Amino acid sequence: MSSSRPVFRSRWLPYLLVAPQLIITVIFFIWPAGEALWYSLQSVDPFGFSSQFVGLDNFVTLFHDSYYLDAFWTTIKFSTFVTVSGLLVSLFFAALVEYIVRGSRFYQTLMLLPYAVAPAVAAVLWIFLFNPGRGLITHFLAEFGYDWNHAQNSGQAMFLVVFASVWKQISYNFLFFYAALQSIPRSLIEAAAIDGAGPIRRFFKIALPLIAPVSFFLLVVNLVYAFFDTFPVIDAATSGGPVQATTTLIYKIYREGFTGLDLASSAAQSVVLMFLVIVLTVVQFRYVESKVRYQ
């Protein structure tokens, strides 16, 4: 029986092939994570010239800080809104293209445009549209008697950053959902149609279970996106306000580490955020992935 395992002429070639990825991982993940863990156990002066070992004192102080706990729950709420809304909206548009306006190249191109926009630019775009004094959308809302001012209303500020973040991520999710729907064998869809199943029933009974692995992958990706990659949106749109209503953990880390120069506290917050994302990812892979396997 022949083995399908590749054979290299040189024993060092496999190591050379994986070396670039290992170097990148060490430099951009393991090293910074180690530095953050070391600083989280120290009391560091604002300029980082001297430090003193304090053990877990930074973490104890952290979880007794009401502002940090508020940011923690804001992050959970914000990430849930962005992840769930982004997946549902993207799946809806992908199904719309596949089952209703299939073949519309213009529509598909239009759906991919937000992916080419930088997160900060996306935030600025929606700030212009939601500007309390001159925004097109706020003018439209005013016609119905709704007063919009996200600089003073915490609920409106949260809606703005969630909306901008979801809009920025729609293209990415749409691309994967649309490709997954396209990969479903046409024979299954045609057989269901012959049996009298309508478009909605075909989608929920056939398409949705078959694209479950892609949905799980996007769930993990969108969760990480909401935790980390939405920082430019929040910074450009609300700067964490009003009254820290949109201050997430990643934004609080930036503000205390780079603005307040509290290196020890920001490092401790980074470690907590890192372990939180790792735990959530492991839980998803353990308990969610097992439910999306199909023959």
Swiss-Prot record:
UniProt name for this protein: sn-glycerol-3-phosphate transport system permease protein UgpA
Ranges annotated as spanning the membrane: 12-32, 81-101, 110-130, 157-177, 208-228, 263-283
GO-annotated biological processes: transmembrane transport
Stretches assigned to the ABC transmembrane type-1 domain: 76-284
Family of this protein: Belongs to the binding-protein-dependent transport system permease family. UgpAE subfamily.
Cytoplasmic topology ranges: 1-11, 102-109, 178-207, 284-295
Top-level lineage group: Bacteria
Encoding gene (name): ugpA
InterPro entries: MetI-like, MetI-like_sf, UgpAE/MalFG_permease
PROSITE patterns, alphabetized: ABC_TM1
Keyword terms of this UniProt record: Cell inner membrane, Cell membrane, Membrane, Transmembrane, Transmembrane helix, Transport
Localization, UniProt: Cell inner membrane
SUPFAM superfamilies, per the entry: MetI-like (SSF161098)
UniProt cross-references to Pfam families, sorted A to Z: BPD_transp_1 (PF00528)
Organism: Escherichia coli O1:K1 / APEC
